[in-house]
Regions:
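Extracellular receptor-binding modules and their adjoining Ser/Thr/Gly/Asp/Asn-rich linkers
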Residues: 1-2, 41-135, 143, 163-198
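An N-terminus-focused feature that recognizes amino-terminal "leader" regions
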Residues: 1-35
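Intrinsic-disorder/low-complexity loop/linker signature
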Residues: 20, 33, 72, 136-137, ...
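Generic structural motif
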Residues: 22-28, 47-50, 124, 151
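Ser/Thr- and Asn-enriched, surface-exposed coil loops between beta-strands
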Residues: 28-39, 152-166
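Broad, structure-driven detector of short, well-ordered beta-strand segments within folded domains
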Residues: 140-155
Length: 198
């Protein structure tokens, strides 16, 4: 187990593991201000490469989060759904798995995509949009927690990404045998991005 500390505005932590030994990202925790710690774990000693991307997140007059790239161009806002995000970064997205879940425990969305990047890497990521509702209180205009998770892959191959819709309890009318839901509903999904030209 290792704790990796870094400083970033709104981080996307990714890792490259070519050793054949599974490495799991357990958690990413804010330790104050722009300081973060990501904990990774493997069952035996292993070396990995990791990358931390810090997005420039600004809040405009409508209180929506806007993500800008290094050129100052808006890439995405917290009100965008996945089809719009795909249009904004058209040509770089090679796969997407948008989905919507309510009273649903288990694999929410899973997809695979083949890739052969031109000398770059493939980003495997997830974005949870701000339509999460907890016990009747709508959390609007925010991305909760980390923007993304996943890793880079070089060369050619197949990437698979899955997300889960967790329950928040204790009241669940559907199904009755799962008593862990605050009437939660959230949009989520995964994207595969060819970052070789970015």
């Amino acid at each position: 187990m290792a704790d990796i500390a870094y400083s970033a505005t709104n981080p996307l932590f990714v890792m490259e593991n070519t050793n054949g030994i599974p490495v799991v990202v357990i958690s990413t925790t804010n330790t104050g201000g722009n300081s973060w710690v990501t904990r990774v774990m493997a069952l035996s000693p292993v070396s990995i490469n990791y990358f931390v991307f810090s997005s420039d997140v600004l809040i405009d007059g409508s209180e929506l989060l806007v993500v800008y790239n290094s050129a100052g161009q808006p890439v995405a806002t917290s009100s965008m759904r996945y089809p719009l995000i795909k249009q904004v970064i058209a040509g770089n997205v090679i796969g997407a798995g948008p989905d919507y879940g309510q009273y649903d425990y288990g694999a929410a969305t899973s997809f695979s995509a083949s890739f052969s990047p031109g000398g770059g890497r493939i980003g495997v990521g997830a974005i949870r949009t701000p339509s999460t509702q907890f016990n009747g209180s709508l959390l609007s205009g925010e991305w909760r927690g980390n923007i993304g998770l996943g890793g880079w892959m070089s060369g050619a191959g197949v990437a698979t990404f899955s997300t889960f819709n967790w329950r928040f309890g204790p009241s669940s009318p559907n199904p009755p045998n799962f008593q862990y839901d605050y009437q939660s509903a959230l949009d989520y999904g995964g994207i595969l991005i060819d970052v070789s030209n970015l």
